[in-house]
């Protein structure tokens, strides 16, 4: 039996302006080289651009985009008898949100455009509508899990 205790699960803090945990999670993922003020600037500009584009509540667009990109199931490489199988595993809500945010940021960085705020706002609006690279990544992951359903018993 292990002598070490289990780690306490940290709850995400909310950001200072919108008092929203998802915004803060997004800020922490976009952060580079410890420049948090720049990360906040990018996110808030993106939120303003979403407001201008859709003329609806930008936080509801953000929520809808993250909900749309969040995967239910993913594949994990598992070595069994000398060969590696892609084993489908269910994902919890926290891990799913983290994956969704990561995919949204990767997709927005790949986009052509002027600046990160513009690219991020475009990707979030597209994801809320059900299109874009992040949605494609989720569908690809689900297809992969479905194709490897035979290995589900290796969990």
From Swiss-Prot:
Domain of life: Eukaryota
GO biological process, one term: translation
Coiled coil: none
Gene Ontology molecular function: rRNA binding; structural constituent of ribosome
UniProt xrefs under PROSITE patterns: RIBOSOMAL_S7
GO CC terms, sorted: chloroplast; small ribosomal subunit
Chief location bin: plastid
Cellular compartment(s): Plastid, Chloroplast
Keywords: Chloroplast, Plastid, Ribonucleoprotein, Ribosomal protein, RNA-binding, rRNA-binding
Functional summary from the UniProt entry: One of the primary rRNA binding proteins, it binds directly to 16S rRNA where it nucleates assembly of the head domain of the 30S subunit.
Complex formation: Part of the 30S ribosomal subunit.
Family: Belongs to the universal ribosomal protein uS7 family.
The protein's name: Small ribosomal subunit protein uS7c
Organism: Asparagus officinalis (Garden asparagus)
């Amino acid at each position: 039996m292990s002598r070490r205790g289990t780690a306490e699960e940290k709850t995400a803090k909310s950001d200072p302006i919108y008092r929203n945990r998802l915004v803060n999670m997004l800020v922490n993922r976009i952060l580079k080289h410890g420049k948090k003020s720049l990360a906040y600037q990018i996110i808030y500009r993106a939120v303003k651009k979403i407001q201008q584009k859709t003329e609806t509540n930008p936080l509801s667009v953000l929520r809808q985009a993250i909900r749309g990109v969040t995967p239910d199931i993913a594949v994990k490489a598992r070595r069994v008898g000398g060969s590696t199988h892609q084993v489908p595993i269910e994902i919890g809500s926290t891990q799913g949100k983290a994956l969704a945010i990561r995919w949204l940021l990767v997709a927005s960085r790949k986009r052509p455009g002027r600046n990160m705020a513009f690219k991020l706002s475009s990707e979030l609006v597209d994801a809320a509508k059900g299109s874009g690279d992040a949605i494609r990544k989720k569908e690809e992951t689900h297809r992969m899990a479905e194709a490897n359903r035979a290995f589900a018993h290796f969990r």
